[in-house]
Amino acid sequence: MSAAEIKDKVYDIIVSKMGVNKDQIKPESKFADDLGADSLDTVELIMELENEFGVQIPDEDAEKIGTVQQAIDYIVNKKVS
C-alpha cells in the first residue's frame, strides 16, 4: 500500500468516525482543536486505524498522534518496517 493510499484511507476513516467533510481535513489538522474530537473519538480513531491497517499502536505512541499527518506518518512507518 502506497503512502497516498494510506493517506486516502486515513481521511476516509476520519470522515466516517468523526462526521467531518473530507474537504475540512488537512494534513496539519489537529484532531481535538480543528476536527472537534474528544478523548473517546481519539481512542475510537486509533482503534479503527489499528484494525484497518493491521498495526498495533501502543498508548504511549497514540498520545503523540495529534494531527492527521502524524497519523499518516505513523502508519506509513509501521507498514514499511
UniProtKB/Swiss-Prot annotation:
The keyword Lipid metabolism applies. Keywords: Cytoplasm, Fatty acid biosynthesis, Fatty acid metabolism, Lipid biosynthesis, Lipid metabolism, Phosphopantetheine, Phosphoprotein. It comes from the Bacteria. Its main location: cytoplasm. One of its GO terms (molecular function) is acyl binding. One of its GO terms (cellular component) is cytosol. Residues 4-79 form the Carrier domain. The modification O-(pantetheine 4'-phosphoryl)serine is found at residue 39. Belongs to the acyl carrier protein (ACP) family. Carrier of the growing fatty acid chain in fatty acid biosynthesis. HAMAP family: Acyl_carrier. This is Acyl carrier protein. It comes from Chlorobaculum tepidum (strain ATCC 49652 / DSM 12025 / NBRC 103806 / TLS). The lineage of its organism: Bacteria, Pseudomonadati, Chlorobiota, Chlorobiia, Chlorobiales.
